[in-house]
Amino acid sequence: MLTRALGTQGLTVSALGLGCMGMSEFYGHRDDAESTATLLHAVDRGITLFDTADIYGPHLNEVLVGKALAGIRNRVVLATKFGILRDPANPSVRGVCGRPDYVRSACEASLKRLGFETIDLYYQHRVDPEVPIEDTVGAMAGLVKAGKVRFLGLSEVSPATLRRACAVHPISAVQSEYSLWTRDPEDGLLQTCRELGVGFVPYSPLGRGFLTGQIRRFEDFEPGDYRRNSPRFQGENFQKNLDLVARIEDMAAARGCTPSQLGPRAATSSPSPAPSAATAWTRTWAPSTTCSAPANSRS
C-alpha cells in the first residue's frame, strides 16, 4: 500500500483509508460482526488510516472501531471528530459546537469510547460560526500539549478559516467531500492546502456509494437509508446521476478495474495540489486490486 504524508508534522498514512460511518448507521442495517471483519481485513491489506466520529451511531461507531482495532493499535492511525451535536431523542436534529470547554469534554468522551490513550488525528467536524476558530483550535492545541491528541484536522472548512486556524497551530489535514461528482474543493481549498502544507483527505470518493455502480433503482436503498431523503437521489437527479455512473463504468473498464476502485484513485491522483489520502466504505469495494491507465492515456 502506498503512503502519504499529511501535513508537515510527521503524520504518515496509507493512501487509502477506511471511513467507518456507514458501519453504524445511515446506510441501512448494521452488522457489527461484518464490520469488525472488514476493519481487520483492511489492516491486513495495508490500510492504516481509519476514520470515525463521535456522532456516528451516535457514539456506537467509536466503540465498534476501538474494540476491533484494540489489539493492533500500533499498526493504525485513528482519526475521529467532534463538533456536531445530535438530540438523543431526535437524532435528525443537529447543531454545532466549537466552545473550548466542549472541545475538551468531547475528546475525553471519545477516548473513553475508543478505549485508547491518544487520538492520532482529531478533526473539528464542522466549524461553529458562533465561536472564533482561533478559540476552538487553541483548545485543540491544548489537547496536543496534554498528550491526548497527536495531530489536528478540520472538516469542511473554507480557505480563509483554514488560514486563521493554521496561524494558531499547525493543521495536518483537511477533510472534505471530493469525488468524480463533487468537485467543490477545487475552488480554492486544495490550493490553500498546498500553500500552507496541509494534507487533504477526500471523503465519500465513491459518491455515497452511488459511484460503485451497484445502485440501479431507488428501491435499492434499504428502508432507513438516509439516501432515500437526499436530493441527489430524488426524481430526475437519480437518472442523471445514473448516466454519470455509466460513463464512469466505461472509464473503469478501459483501465481494467471497477468503478469502486476508480473513485478513490481519481480523488487522490487528479491534479491534487496537496498530499491526499481518500477514505471510503462500501461492501463492494476491493482495495487490494489496482487500477491502471490504458496505453496512450492519462490517468
Name each model-derived stretch.
Residues 111-129:
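Active-site groove signature of glycoside hydrolases
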Residues 1-77:
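N-terminal binding-site loop/beta-alpha segment at the start of enzyme catalytic domains
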Residues 127-298:
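Beta/alpha (TIM)-barrel catalytic core signal, keyed to glycine-rich beta->alpha loops juxtaposed to Asp/Glu
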